[in-house]
Amino acid sequence: MIASAALTTLLGLGVWFDLRCRRIPNVLTVAGLGAALVLRGVLGVGALVDGVEGAGLALLLSLPPFTLGMLGGGDVKLLVAVGGFMGPVRLIGAFLMIALVGGALALLEALRRRALGEVVSRSFAMVKYLACFGRFGYRPTLEAQGAMTVPYGLAIGVGSVVWWFAAGGRL
């Protein structure tokens, strides 16, 4: 119960900051990871190791999208804190749920901007270029005119909470 309260508080604040400021503060993510590891440490060395492995796996899984500019640094650090709570086994399901929520948010944003056709066309072109040449072609930055961004902290928050409680809501 304490872990559920700590995780939902962390994620609620992360979502709030991401929606309001488009950034997730380091103090929040570090405190979240610290809380996860302390709570796991109380349960024993095995639980603590599980939390460290979950945090490490979250870092490994989120680095590729970060290097491609698909995630911000705050998103990565929030995912690492989530990994500390989830552990490596539940983290895989959480990442899939987060990706589904993030995809739905991106689709809604494209529809809101009336840019769904353009987004689909660019996505196919990017995949085609990657398949033909083994690397990504032109990728507009977030500062490019008309760049579409989604506050991924919202996807992380919703996806993580749904998966946490679906998996039992305990460390």
What do the predicted segments below correspond to?
Residues 1-171:
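A membrane-topology feature that recognizes alpha-helical transmembrane segments
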